[in-house]
Amino acid sequence: MNGIHDTGGAHGYGPVYREPNEPVFRYDWEKTVMSLLPALLANANFNLDEFRHSIERMGPAHYLEGTYYEHWLHVFENLLVEKGVLTATEVATGKAASGKTATRVLTPAIVDDSSAPGLLRPGGGFSFFPVGDKVRVLNKNPVGHTRMPRYTRAKWGQWSSTMVCFVTPDTAAHGKGEQPQHVYTVSFTSVELWGQDASSPKDTIRVDLWDDYLEPA
């Protein structure tokens, strides 16, 4: 979707400053939020692409003003209500409804086993593009989740490598199954992406893109 999260090439945000010795966590509550994500994924409350798409659906002002882990907390509070795991009242009060009991005890071993497969998948059909082929990113504006950056659309690049098969985010985020596809690392010149006035015209930008995002030259 064309949202505030997809800001590559946009103006007006200022430089990105790197803070020396930046702490991993600024507040204790951030540690709790981080530990909740693998637990919720292991319990199949939602998948990683649903998680990302929930962040994309945040209001623009909230997205820009919120911190990294505030984005995660927003997902937990909203997606778990959408999934029927929690109620809005439970989220607002911080108290579980009476009579609710856990269905199982989540152990570190369960979390490790559930995360081990990652998003890599076997198969996915044949690879459409041989290495070195020139490819074009489709020019489309999906209203749902996608991993196709807006700044790459309708641009020409060269396929430099294949990263085997992964879960397709565009379907997994919307209850349409994993539908694994090949993922390609596509190289773009900065001039192709940003035009003749690119600030670093000799740069090459490499983007990982799924089969469905590409067409041959």
Swiss-Prot record:
It catalyses: an aliphatic primary amide = an aliphatic nitrile + H2O. Industrial production of acrylamide is now being developed using some of these enzymes. Keywords: Lyase. Pfam families: NHase_beta_C, NHase_beta_N. Signal peptide: none annotated. Its EC number is 4.2.1.84. The keyword Aminoacyl-tRNA synthetase does not apply. It comes from the Bacteria. GO terms for molecular function: nitrile hydratase activity; transition metal ion binding. The keyword Transport does not apply. NHase catalyzes the hydration of various nitrile compounds to the corresponding amides. Belongs to the nitrile hydratase subunit beta family. Heterodimer of an alpha and a beta chain. This is Nitrile hydratase subunit beta.
